[in-house]
Swiss-Prot record:
Function according to Swiss-Prot or TrEMBL: Catalyzes the transfer of a phosphate group to glutamate to form L-glutamate 5-phosphate.
Record protein name field: Glutamate 5-kinase
Enzyme Commission no: 2.7.2.11
Superkingdom of origin: Bacteria
EC top class named in words: transferase
HAMAP family to which the protein is assigned, alphabetical: ProB
PROSITE patterns hit by this protein: GLUTAMATE_5_KINASE, PUA
Source organism: Pseudomonas savastanoi pv. phaseolicola (strain 1448A / Race 6) (Pseudomonas syringae pv. phaseolicola (strain 1448A / Race 6))
Keyword terms: Amino-acid biosynthesis, ATP-binding, Cytoplasm, Kinase, Nucleotide-binding, Proline biosynthesis, Transferase
Catalytically driven reaction(s): L-glutamate + ATP = L-glutamyl 5-phosphate + ADP
Pathway the protein takes part in: Amino-acid biosynthesis; L-proline biosynthesis; L-glutamate 5-semialdehyde from L-glutamate: step 1/2
InterPro entries, A to Z: AceGlu_kinase-like_sf, Asp/Glu/Uridylate_kinase, G5K_ProB, Glu/AcGlu_kinase, Glu_5kinase, Glu_5kinase/COase_Synthase, Glutamate_5-kinase_CS, PUA
GO cellular component, one term: cytosol
Amino acid sequence: MTGAQRWVVKIGSALLTADGKGLDRNAMGVWVEQMAALHEAGVELVLVSSGAVAAGMSRLGWTARPSAMHELQAAAAIGQMGLVQAWESSFAEHGRHTAQILLTHDDLSDRKRYLNARSTLRTLVELGVVPVINENDTVVTDEIRFGDNDTLAALVANLVEADLLVILTDRDGMFDADPRNNPEAQLIYEARADDPALDAVAGGTGGALGRGGMQTKLRAARLAARSGAHTVIVGGRIERVLARLKGGERLGTLLSPERGMLAARKQWLAGHLQTRGTLVLDDGAVAALAKDQKSLLPVGVKLVQGSFRRGEMVVCVASDGREIARGLSNYSAIEAQKIIGHSSESIVRELGYMAEPELIHRDNLILV
């Protein structure tokens, strides 16, 4: 993990609370100390934090996790306040700024909102801010019961194109048998995320405060692998676990993707999106895409055809109609009509704002 420069770190409820008696500020301080050290070493960091419901339960004096939706949502709303304040104050002690982001799965399934969230997160990371992400439990419906922050963390890893997803849990990793029942159980140090043999050993459920058992963690690793991210499922009670992972120590279970990041992303783009429009390119843009594999700039587009929204797939063709590439447009068809033929520096003048300097970024282009 020494070469991974963008990490998504997910910390479960059991590691942030004092045996269900509210947030453990000392434990959170230890986590922040480790994450601040990673930051100092040049790692771009996104934190997915559980604990809001558990913190709210403690404030309300509840000892058992309620099953009623409205009670869970009330606990989440109350606990989120203290959770964010605790992270903010702890990171401030190390000179680090934080930003709160509450997401639902709908935010990441709607392409326009997905792109907006991605732009915001990338900007925060580039500013050296640590985004603190949680599921917006107070407004979702069945997600609060069936959703989990392991899955959210994997989707965030896809969103920010992370190199590494670290899922910190109260177990040391994945075992070939349940270590609570079998003293001969062996830790699985490394495997492919898509290995079907892992399904048989990922049984069990989460604890009383959390929602995610090992099955959800395996599913999260497979989601993260779609964009080429590695996942480490590792015990959060291991001393200096993040620093030791950064140093290359073999801890927990490393689940690797089948393909590299770019190849996985290209396959996802090619296989899962329908085209919504066409961009007719000039000869210079055709050469820039086909030979130099550069991004598509507005200046190289002659004509916009069809109706598409920001984030939808469009076909890029040469003047003679030959298909050159496909990609995700950073602008809608209406916006693209206004900026084609102009330099990137002119986008603000034409639209009044600039979402991205490219019409299609090269990472979102597939040559055909």
